[in-house]
Amino acid sequence: MIYEAHVRGMTNLNMDVPPDIRGTYAGLAYPSVIEYLKKLGVTAIELMPIHQFVNDSFLQEKGLSNYWGYNTIGFFAPHNAYSSSGQRGEQVNEFKSMVKAYHRAGMEVILDVVYNHTAEGNNRGPTLSFKGIDNGAYYRLVDNDRRHYFDTTGTGNSLLMRSPHALQLITDSLRYWVTEMHVDGFRFD
């Protein structure tokens, strides 16, 4: 049985988890959380997006933030705000420890991945990565006006999946999460 969970949401209000690790990878790996899932008969935990993501400017202008994580900017990095240490880079070790804890409990870890768009938005969005490297190789552009993005995702852009560059990026990312981070599977958004 697969249990879908949000890293922050699963433990943020859980009084059985120490306050300093609630809403983090360490909190998700806390023994009482894993025991609860085992009692339910869960065999795999599916984590909602955990790739590094950014906040949308329109949310920030309203005093809000991107809770769900569907605005990816780093396909090879676990989101650093989910690290209990607060140190950049420590999220990798904490994520790996969480995966090990689930494997020791006989459960698999599945990631909800978002490879159909990025946080760079439309032509007015920020230049954070692929726009600056090779815009036309990574994004679907409007045929008669290549300044604008062909948006099939409702986010301002869509990755160009038939591009060898985009396809290589995605397969390299998937391989990384399996070989280096030891996850067991994926759900594609």
Question: Where are each of the predicted segments found?
Answer:
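Active-site capping/gating regions of soluble enzymes
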Residues: 185-186
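Substrate-binding/active-site clefts of carbohydrate-active enzymes
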Residues: 8-26, 30-31, 35-182
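Basic K/R-rich, polyanion-interacting modules in nucleoproteins and related proteins
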Residues: 1
